[in-house]
């Protein structure tokens, strides 16, 4: 006996949605049972999909294409109950198969994950893991785990090549101004000021100014849709982008191509290591020495001959194994896009390895003194200052003090991406302060006076260190307190001495006054990292050309 697929009311709603005859009950899935024309049930049927010859979803039964929220965990995200776009109410029991689309190519790293190509469509089977989902590739029919941040819900705005979810204006400028991008390269990003709006950023060129980026506000309509100029409105972001890709319509230039997206952050070497991070030493190849740290050497290497990694080693006898592994535990626990990611450790024999994210440009200090950082413009330095403040704001929120914040402990990657590293002296604190054991070494020129004299470290002593880092940054790697030994520094600071404003580099008065606030003798009077991050985020915006308006 055939299964009864739906009520009379459901039939009526679907028929009203498609009065021209586009609706066929046999083409849709209700509840968990697919109903074919013979009335038989098929539990293996494709849920919520109109079965056309191409095998793709009918656009009337897809989620809102401008849904921009992050992919949700545990089946709570996405759209489970769907309805025809032309009807005000849904049809109970109509279920949409959850499909994601690949935003990047991905190569399998172990036996449990799945290789895929950009554009591949995959059905989600299990979304309970926070970083890895189990899927079936709808092209190859292979099943396996995939990294969540490499995919987006199909037909959502996140799946568009031109949409950048977590990009601020300064970062948009850096991405668009890459040399390989022609005039008209563009991206769309969420507005920093309007929670329902967006911003369109376009690379342009003018005589006397050269290449630069123009920004336009995309404003929402009350009844749905978007506009840049009031005489041109569009039902979706996709429609808006398509229109301005055919005609500039008052923009500085026609939208020529989407800005290339950087690869997303990977927090694990592979899904097998998401819950454990001890790996065999034989899987690591040390290829090139990068430098020497407080407790050992740092190498560039490969994991399983495929993945770039940085490997920090512990010299025997310089630090206890337990303390070294404590550093690893801290780095693994805290995740932020401005902190260097820890991948794994090799602790079964000496020397112990910490395997972490590789940053191609090395330390900020070397970058400023010897690398491409020597040629950075002032706005580039502001961008780096903002990123470091963002990472420290995160540590501040987690009650974690760094205790060794300096340019040598910030790493630089492509597009001047900056990340904080070296938690060798960091400690998680339950109170506001941490007092180290006697005999602990710390860098005097970067250390707050209360930490030098009384051994009391807090997030406010990190703020002091951040002020010293800013001096390093804006002087392109100059040594703090030039010509002074550590003892002289301590004595002078106690007498109220502070480094003067440099005269051999561009150094605005307002930034120097901010440094003096970071160096206040009273820790409680120093600014928070939340304030510092907001200050530098706003700094470049207020000094740049405002958002453009397109004339009606």
Swiss-Prot record:
GO terms for biological process: actin cytoskeleton organization; adherens junction organization; axon guidance; cell differentiation; cell surface receptor protein tyrosine kinase signaling pathway; cellularization; epithelial cell-cell adhesion; female germline ring canal formation. One of its GO terms (molecular function) is ATP binding. Residues 162-259 form the SH2 domain. After the first 8 hours of development, accumulates almost exclusively in neural tissues such as the brain, ventral nerve chord, and eye-antennal disks, and in differentiating smooth muscle. Gene3D superfamilies: Phosphorylase Kinase, domain 1, SH2 domain, SH3 Domains, Transferase(Phosphotransferase) domain 1. Residues 95-156 form the SH3 domain. The active site is at residue 404. The keyword Oxidoreductase does not apply. ATP binds at residues 290-298, 312. PROSITE patterns: PROTEIN_KINASE_ATP, PROTEIN_KINASE_DOM, PROTEIN_KINASE_TYR, SH2, SH3. Its EC number is 2.7.10.2. SMART domains: SH2, SH3, TyrKc. The modification Phosphotyrosine is found at residue 434. InterPro entries: Kinase-like_dom_sf, Non-receptor_tyrosine_kinases, Prot_kinase_dom, Protein_kinase_ATP_BS, Ser-Thr/Tyr_kinase_cat_dom, SH2, SH2_dom_sf, SH3-like_dom_sf. Phosphorylated. Residues 284-537 form the Protein kinase domain. One of its GO terms (cellular component) is nephrocyte diaphragm. Tyrosine-protein kinase that may play a role in the development of neural tissue and smooth muscle. May contribute to tyrosine phosphorylation of Dscam1, a cell surface receptor involved in targeting of growing axons during eye morphogenesis. Interacts with hzg. Belongs to the protein kinase superfamily. Tyr protein kinase family. SRC subfamily. This is Tyrosine-protein kinase Src64B. It comes from Drosophila melanogaster (Fruit fly). The lineage of its organism: Eukaryota, Metazoa, Ecdysozoa, Arthropoda, Hexapoda.
């Amino acid at each position: 006996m055939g299964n009864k697929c739906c009520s009379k009311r459901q039939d009526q709603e679907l028929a009203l949605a498609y009065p021209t005859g586009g609706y066929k009950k046999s083409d849709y899935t209700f509840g968990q049972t697919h109903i074919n024309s013979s009335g038989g049930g098929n539990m293996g049927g494709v849920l919520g999909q109109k079965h056309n010859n191409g095998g793709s979803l009918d656009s009337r039964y897809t989620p809102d294409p401008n849904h921009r929220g992050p992919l949700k965990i545990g089946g709570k995200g996405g759209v489970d109950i769907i309805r025809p776009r032309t009807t005000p109410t849904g049809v109970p029991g109509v279920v949409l198969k959850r499909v994601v689309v690949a935003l990047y190519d991905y190569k399998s790293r172990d036996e449990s994950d799945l290789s895929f190509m950009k554009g591949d469509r995959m059905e989600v089977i299990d979304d309970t893991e926070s970083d890895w989902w189990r899927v079936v590739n709808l092209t190859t029919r292979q099943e396996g785990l995939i990294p969540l941040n490499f995919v987006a819900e199909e037909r959502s705005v996140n799946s568009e090549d031109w949409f950048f979810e977590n990009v601020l204006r300064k970062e948009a400028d850096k991405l668009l101004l890459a040399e390989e991008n022609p005039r008209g390269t563009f991206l769309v990003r969420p507005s920093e000021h309007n929670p329902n709006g967006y911003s369109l950023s376009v690379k342009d060129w003018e005589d006397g100014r050269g290449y630069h980026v123009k920004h336009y506000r995309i404003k929402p309509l009350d009844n749905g849709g978007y506009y840049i100029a009031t005489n041109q409105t569009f039902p979706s972001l996709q429609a808006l982008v398509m229109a301005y890709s055919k005609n500039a319509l008052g923009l500085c230039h026609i939208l020529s191509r989407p800005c290339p997206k950087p690869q997303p952050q990977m927090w694990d070497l592979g899904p097998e290591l998401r819950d454990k991070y001890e790996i065999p030493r034989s899987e690591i190849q040390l290829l090139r020495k990068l430098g020497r740290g407080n407790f050992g050497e740092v190498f560039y290497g490969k994991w399983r001959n495929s993945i770039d990694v940085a490997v920090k080693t512990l010299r025997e006898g310089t630090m206890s194994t337990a303390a070294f592994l404590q550093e690893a535990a801290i780095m693994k626990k805290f995740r932020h896009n401005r902190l260097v990611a820890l991948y794994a450790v090799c602790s079964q024999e000496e020397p112990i390895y910490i395997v972490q994210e590789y940053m191609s440009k090395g330390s900020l200090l070397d970058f400023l003194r010897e690398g491409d950082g020597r040629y950075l413009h002032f706005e580039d330095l502001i961008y780096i200052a903002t990123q470091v403040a963002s990472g420290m704001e995160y540590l501040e929120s987690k009650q974690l003090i760094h205790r060794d914040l300096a340019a040598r402990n910030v790493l630089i990657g492509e597009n001047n991406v900056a990340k904080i590293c070296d938690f060798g002296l960091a400690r998680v604190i339950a109170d506001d302060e941490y007092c180290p054991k006697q005999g602990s070494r710390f860098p005097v020129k970067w250390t707050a006076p209360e930490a030098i004299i009384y051994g009391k470290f807090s997030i406010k002593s990190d703020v002091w260190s951040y002020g010293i880092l800013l001096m390093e940054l804006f002087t392109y790697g100059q040594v703090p307190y030039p010509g002074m030994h550590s003892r002289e520094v301590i004595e002078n600071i106690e007498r109220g001495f502070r480094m003067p404003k440099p005269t051999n580099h561009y150094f605005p008065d307002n930034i120097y006054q901010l440094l003096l606030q970071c160096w206040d003798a009273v820790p409680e009077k120093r600014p928070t990292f939340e304030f510092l991050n907001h200050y530098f985020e706003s700094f470049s915006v207020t000094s740049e050309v405002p958002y453009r308006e397109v004339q009606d």
